[in-house]
Amino acid sequence: MTTKQWGITPPISTAPATEQENALNTALINELKNQNLFESPAESEKRVKVLDELQQITTEFVKKVSLAKHMNEKMANEAGGKIFTYGSYRLGVYGPGSDIDTLVVVPKHVSRDNFFQDLEPMLREREEVTDLAAVPDAYVPIIKFKFLGISIDLIFARLSVPRVPRDLELSDNNLLKGVEERCVLSLNGTRVTDQILQLVPNRAVFKHALRAIKFWAQRRAIYANVVGFPGGVAWAMMVARICQLYPNAVSSVIVAKFFRILHQWNWPQPILLKPIEDGPLQVRIWNPKLYPSDKAHRMPIITPAYPSMCATHNITLSTQTIILREMVRAGEIADQIMVKALPWSALFQKHDFFHRYKHYLTITAAAKTAEAQLKWAGLVESKLRHLVTRLELVDAIALAHPFNKGFDKVYNCSSEEEAQQVASGVTLEVAYESTDHEKLANDTVNEEKADNTESKADGSENGEKQIFPVYTTTCYIGLELEKKKGHPIKRLDISWPTQEFYELCKKWDKYDDTLMNVFIKNTKNTALPDEVFEPGEERPKATKKRSTADTAHSTEQLKRQKVSTA
């Protein structure tokens, strides 16, 4: 009897788990529980309730639009509309506080404009909905909100069909006919997730292994598609491929094999869960023989659903180097764990990013309103990888390491002049409060509700001084400099990469120089701000200066590197 082949190659091993591997698997699951990665049954039931409510709202939304477009009651009721999930929730690897990636699928007579003009107000009217922020001009437009305290990211797709019944499934490629590209991308979130689950030998093994790998990647700060690291779908496909190669293994073995196999992988050979398939659309499918840009992908991980795309096109030379270094480190730890020389907790130690380098670039996006900052900070963050690739071309820089998330602040300034200085990168003793994107969403709502009446120059009616807020998001890039024995770095000129980055950001068609700015500074590790460290974490200490004149000159040149806010 032949064993079923999972994936495009035969398995490496079909051996069942040993007693020790089973014991290590139990220990792994216990460690994941200790790390609070599993949600309580009550919270999971609450998510189901929220999705049921969203389905009802979607049905009402489609009916409302249908009636407005002169359909009769029967046709409007039959038009349907359906909610799908994708990402970690659909994969079954969500945890406490995770958002739900959600897709609303509608028939052809319901437009994207209706999504924002009709569905968004319907959501705002619900008392269960808070922190709602719409981003209609994103490439994949989205509405973010909380429903009964659960974060929802809601995207939109319109099919070229007159009705979307509740029993509709998205697996049929023909459903993509006549659908615009942005909707294909949205639909493929669900389609890819479903295919990943269909292409693994054992879903329970896959899910536990994926929870472990995702948590490891987050702890090591290498989980963020936007800045050049794999995102959730890419990590899921990598884990799925290892499951295919070891179809009878338990999760502990999958995790241990994961690091060694992927570090030794013959990149840029792609990771595929199944052969790339053709389909009914005249659309681009990943093909490095046909497209030079596809050939340039360093660690291609290809989505299984038609049309196949590369989920890791953002990876740069630097981020690839960092990923592979982390896999070597993790592989060595996993080897020790598998012989019971170390506990699983050793694998999940926090990153040392803010201790690893001597010099960092701080990239700060600033705006004078919360609404502007939500969009502007997202735009600047999306361009960071382009700054990384330009820094990689500087002779003196061996590696440019972007941190995987930004840090948000609100500076409360006492005058317009002070606010302008803060937004331009001038360091002032200004009161600030920590914030996050949820607070920005709240502030955006508050701004919309605020009176448009002109404030008095000396402040509000109750005598309080007027506050001029400046919202900032700061991202970090660690610089690893070239180490050439006997040839110390005499000058580090990053004016060209930074100027190109400024120009790239400010080409955005929504850029407003009266509201927004971006600036870059060089910061030594000893001068990093408190918010990048956890409470009680030891900060980097200044090292004793070496006596060589060249080394001193090199440090001074970097210190003096002036990066304008052009």
Swiss-Prot record:
Site note Interaction with RNA, residues: 144, 313-314, 385, 500
Superkingdom of this protein's organism: Eukaryota
Positions of region (Disordered): 437-463, 530-566
GO molecular function: ATP binding; metal ion binding; poly(A) RNA polymerase activity; RNA binding
Residue sites binding Mg(2+) 1 per the record: 99, 101
Catalytic function, reaction form: RNA(n) + ATP = RNA(n)-3'-adenine ribonucleotide + diphosphate
GO annotations of cellular component type: cleavage body; cytosol; Mei2 nuclear dot complex; mRNA cleavage and polyadenylation specificity factor complex; nuclear exosome focus; nucleoplasm; nucleus
Annotated ATP binding sites: 86-88, 99-101, 153, 214, 223, 232-233
Cofactor binding mode and count: Binds 2 magnesium ions. Also active with manganese.
One GO process term, biological-process aspect: co-transcriptional mRNA 3'-end processing, cleavage and polyadenylation pathway
SUPFAM superfamilies in the record: Nucleotidyltransferase, PAP/Archaeal CCA-adding enzyme, C-terminal domain, PAP/OAS1 substrate-binding domain
Keywords, alphabetical: ATP-binding, Magnesium, Manganese, Metal-binding, mRNA processing, Nucleotide-binding, Nucleus, RNA-binding, Transferase
EC number: 2.7.7.19
Stated family: Belongs to the poly(A) polymerase family.
Protein name in UniProt: Poly(A) polymerase pla1
